[in-house]
Amino acid sequence: LLKSPASQRGRDFAIMLSCLSDLGYSVEWRVVNSAEYGFPQRRKRTYILARLTGEVWDLEERLSHGVLAEAFPIVEPDSVDWVYIPEDPYRATQEFNKGTGSKTSPFHEAGVMQDGRVATAKVVEAYTGPRMTLGNVLVDEADVPEEFFIEPEKLSQWEYLKGAKRERRVNKQTGYEYTY
């Protein structure tokens, strides 16, 4: 989300921020790998919190001590990068990070935005609680309800549908052949 599209890194997220800013919202975001906070799944998720507030934020302070920083503790970032978001979402679409030659997004794992001003930083989690593995949450097979099991006569069809495929197909309208 923070990096797309490849041709204009960060543009899609900049459009979202521009729209929220245009409506008067202030925004916090965090990219969180749940395994870094003790959960058994290694998957990154982007949390976005937008608030309609008249309160003026100290962006650097909010980055380290805002709602998301309290929910997902972090080590104080070494440095903060500043980005400016165009007020008009159309301008963000056309101009954001274009022609800079940059192969990277200006948005990092944590950030805050108010009135088009963005403070963003690379962060490290500061979680010290218990950590779980998949083994901690797996249910004993004897306790799993019957409807979660695949019937033996449907197993081969299930494996085919869920498995990798390499089939020749033809588009009926154009006659174009492709591999599916």
Please identify what each model-predicted range represents.
Residues 1-180:
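Class I S-adenosyl-L-methionine
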